[in-house]
């Protein structure tokens, strides 16, 4: 009987999203234990000061869970551009754990509401989903925070693909590019996105929320890419 249980525990129940090797019973969350340990996690510190143009940055805290390394780039690429929407449920717990760690020393500043970074209509129709909104929906039960879908809209004239823009262009492209659809007076809002790079999109979204009365806006992203890193090359 013990031999059978040991054999059963080694049966594959899926594959690791990083190395593609079969997972055994007892390994869960989409990653094998070695790959989970090797994920390039970031320290629980604010990234706003690392913004390329800090004088233009808007928002209170910017937090991310993972550094933009090849394995993370591959995961985000599959999630964002190759229809792997199921990755939201795999990746959200990593972000949730990091967020809880980040606020451990500042519990009084815990946000009131989750909001997703919007994408253009053309991007939505091409992908069939907004990856940031999928992450936010998964974070909702993990962090016990309400989620307001559709609160932010991207204005049509600003629908340029930001992931292919140079860092300096992103700030110009994103200026006044977001619209908050209702008042959020006095609320502290957590803005959820997949990748933080220059901070241009985050700042534009934060400005839109602050114009409608938000008390403060924090940015929560799955990954952080240095502005000089060639993100498109990873795709």
Feature-to-residue mapping (PLM):
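Glycine-rich phosphate/pyrophosphate-handling loop used in enzymes and phosphotransfer proteins
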Residues: 1-192, 197-235
